[in-house]
């Protein structure tokens, strides 16, 4: 794969696998492209929540809105321009605030095969 620039318009968002919440994801780079990482966008509707144990290392960049990420009694809240790192094996709960959120993410290795 050659160098590329992406925008949210390039992402084909779909409901996050295995989640009941109104959270959508869209991979732009993944295992189909031959690289070691997944890059994509996530959209969280207002007031949504998901809990999972991270199957991969995940870097989430908040582009719009606000999210709170909780683990082991600690909570961080991130807004536009802020980054949350969630290491593999960490049990997290991600909650969107009343305005919802748009994020970009990078995972290592690819997250989709790790969830199957």
Which residue stretches match the model-derived regions?
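Conserved short histidine dyad/triad with adjacent acidic residue
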Residues: 38-54, 88
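Ligand-binding loop in jelly-roll beta-barrel domains
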Residues: 88-114
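Short, conserved beta-strand element in jelly-roll/cupin
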Residues: 43-44, 53-69
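Structural motif
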Residues: 37-39, 57, 101-103
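Short acidic-glycine-tyrosine-enriched beta hairpin
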Residues: 73-88
């Amino acid at each position: 794969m050659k160098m590329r620039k992406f925008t949210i318009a390039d992402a084909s968002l779909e409901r996050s696998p295995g989640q009941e919440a109104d959270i959508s994801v869209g991979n732009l780079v993944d295992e189909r492209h031959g690289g070691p990482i997944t890059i994509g966008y996530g959209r969280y509707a207002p007031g949504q929540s998901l809990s999972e144990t991270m199957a991969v290392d995940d870097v989430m960049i908040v582009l719009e809105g606000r999210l709170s990420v909780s683990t082991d009694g600690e909570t961080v809240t991130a807004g536009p321009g802020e980054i949350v790192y969630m290491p593999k094996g960490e049990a997290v709960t991600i909650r969107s605030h009343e305005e919802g959120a748009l994020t970009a993410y990078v995972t290592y290795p690819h997250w989709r095969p790790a969830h199957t």
